Amino acid sequence: MTQDPDVLDTWFSSALWAMSPLGWGNNGKLSELYNESDMEDFYPNSLLITGFDIMFFWVARMMMMGEHFNKGQLPFKDIYMHALVRDETGAKMSKSKGNVIDPLDMVEEHSADIIRFTLAYLAVQGRDIKLGAKNLDQFRNFTNKLYNATNYLQLNVDTFKDLGEIEVKTPLGRYMQSRLAVAVEEIRETLETYKFNESARILYNFVWNEFCDWGIEYSKADRESIAELGAIFKETLKMVSPFMPFISDHLYHKLSGTTLEEGDSLMVMNFPKEIKRDLEAENMFALIEEAITALRRAKVIIDMGNSKIDKAYIKLDSQIDTEMAKPFIQKLAKVIEIEFVDAKVENSITDVSDNLEVYLPTAEIDMQPIITKLTRQKEKLEKEIQKLNGMLNNERFVANAPEAVIAENKQALEDAENKIAKVSAELSSFNA
């Protein structure tokens, strides 16, 4: 057997890729495609992004060639190994299976921004991406949230200044700016360490849960803060830009009252930097949120979860500006009158949380239908517990049933016991 002398490694040219596009080894040929200083300016580069499946074929060979031909200087400082994109079941995409998703079709149906954000959010280190319509729909809803926030802000104020151009004075503005500071710090850190999925998750949580679900709802009790919230949202869009460049540019200029042709793209603006936190405002609104959540829970007990009630009492474990807090609690908890007290209120529905207690007076509420409903729930749970105990105490059942079935029944018993304890406590609070 004789080795063929006319064989070139398939990956040989790829191994030179870190240098050859910069003019290395071309001996002056095709000089119109590169500048004389390209090799000096761009070698070594800062980052290579690639799939882990070609690490040996391509990445390792580039490192060896780069080191060999450039006096020991490696071609990249960092290498980011991204996941492989699979179908929604986790199977590798292939034409023979018919499960290939054409990116152009996806862009047409969902938009490039939604696809970018979805892939970033799902790019968990060490795990392949399972991509399907369900994922894309989730992040379509996120873009709807961005549009809805913009529309709400402009229902109240036509245009907004940038955050650096205003002084944030309202309590709500100070609070949301402080929460933005936390998001900025965390997103900068995760981007710098290539944890793009964490960056996307933090951004998603801030926009959806903090700014929209709480900040915008709070602003309905404090219209003066909306101009500040608009500036904070514009700063947020700068963090959205790397993931969703088209939507973020559009909404930023819409809020500014400008067009992209008249101003700069977010892509060339400075990414948000360190913002000073306001812990006093954060602590204040943490208690306000806790009070609202506790009142909502208490209202569910009396079947008035989404209805407005006349009065509620709140007993705090710490001191806050109660007059400032009242409008937010009244608006979001749907309570006409709030009274802060120092002692427990008798004859009331009580909800106890970490830092406060809330009381709903029962004097004007017909409690009998509620007591009847809870009593029936208790009776049903008692029968369920009796049935599960009977099965789990049956030696024959335990010996023959699969372990998964036994574990499922044990969990069901634990859940039923927790529920009956809660129902019994509620009945006791009614002296029933």
Model-derived segments and their meaning:
Residues 3, 72-78, 115, 129-130, ...:
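Acidic/polar loop patches that form or flank catalytic/metal-binding clefts of enzymes
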Residues 19, 57, 116-117, 209, ...:
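Feature representing long, continuous alpha-helical segments
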Residues 20-22, 97, 116-120, 248-255, ...:
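Short hydrophobic alpha-helical segments that form membrane-spanning helices or hydrophobic packing faces
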Residues 78-85, 123, 132-139, 162-170, ...:
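A glycine-rich phosphate-binding loop feature that marks nucleotide/adenosyl-phosphate handling sites
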Residues 87, 120, 160-188, 213-293:
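Acidic, turn-prone loop/beta-hairpin segments
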Residues 137, 255-432:
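C-terminal low-complexity, glycine/proline- and small-hydrophobic-enriched intrinsically disordered tails
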